[in-house]
């Protein structure tokens, strides 16, 4: 179990994470739609996650969403590295009605993000541009090379959920045990 805590003038966040979990979630960010996305992530990654965030929501959701990505990414980094006996690479395509999202990732300990998804609009009060901010914060703090690409769809709720679920499934696959892959790199270290 990895525990992380971060407090700034804008947010206070605590995370408890178990990557070998069963998808249990206890999420409270004060942002209902974001909570729903994080619950979808835990369910489909099979990671147990407790994430509590108190943020300056009266200003904007940006600080809370990005900072949750920072702390979650930091917890993932601690849980994942050093890598031994796992697949390392993962990919998935997830559909939700008319929406389809693709995710490919590498637990490379090298941070990179390609995000080709919706950037304008809202789901309720949630600015859709925050999706990219969240995934960037996760990727850069976890040391993940992450490619998330919209394949089709218009409904912003469906697209968002497909993106989170696709990331979850790809991460679950990358974390899958592979007893033959002592260190899955020709460098001998990740």
From Swiss-Prot:
Domain of life: Bacteria
GO biological process, one term: L-histidine biosynthetic process
Disulfide bonds: none
Keywords for this protein: Amino-acid biosynthesis, Cytoplasm, Histidine biosynthesis, Lyase
Gene Ontology MF, one: imidazoleglycerol-phosphate dehydratase activity
Coarse class of the protein's main subcellular location: cytoplasm
Any Gene Ontology CC annotation: cytoplasm
CDD domains: IGPD
Reaction(s) catalysed (UniProt annotation): D-erythro-1-(imidazol-4-yl)glycerol 3-phosphate = 3-(imidazol-4-yl)-2-oxopropyl phosphate + H2O
Pfam families per record: IGPD
Entry EC number(s): 4.2.1.19
Protein family per UniProt: Belongs to the imidazoleglycerol-phosphate dehydratase family.
NCBIfam families with a match to the protein in the record: PRK00951.2-1, PRK00951.2-4
Name recorded for this polypeptide: Imidazoleglycerol-phosphate dehydratase
Organism annotation: Campylobacter hominis (strain ATCC BAA-381 / DSM 21671 / CCUG 45161 / LMG 19568 / NCTC 13146 / CH001A)
């Amino acid at each position: 179990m990895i525990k992380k805590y971060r407090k700034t003038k804008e947010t206070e966040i605590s995370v408890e994470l178990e990557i070998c979990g069963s998808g249990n979630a206890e999420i409270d960010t004060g942002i209902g739609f974001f909570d729903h996305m994080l619950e979808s992530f835990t369910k489909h990654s099979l990671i147990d996650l407790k994430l509590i965030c108190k943020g300056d929501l009266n200003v904007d959701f940006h600080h809370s969403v990005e900072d949750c990505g920072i702390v979650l990414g930091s917890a993932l980094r601690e849980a994942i590295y050093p890598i031994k006996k796992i697949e390392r690479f993962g990919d998935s395509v997830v559909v939700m009605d008319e929406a389809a999202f693709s995710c490919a990732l590498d637990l490379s300990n090298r941070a990179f993000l390609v995000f080709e998804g919706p950037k304008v609009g809202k789901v309720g009060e949630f600015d859709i541009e925050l999706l990219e901010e969240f995934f960037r914060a996760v990727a850069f703090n976890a040391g993940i090379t992450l490619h998330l690409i919209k394949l089709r769809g218009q409904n912003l709720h469906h697209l968002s959920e497909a993106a989170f679920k696709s990331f979850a499934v790809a991460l679950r696959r990358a974390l899958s045990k592979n007893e033959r892959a002592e260190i899955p790199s020709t460098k001998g270290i990740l």
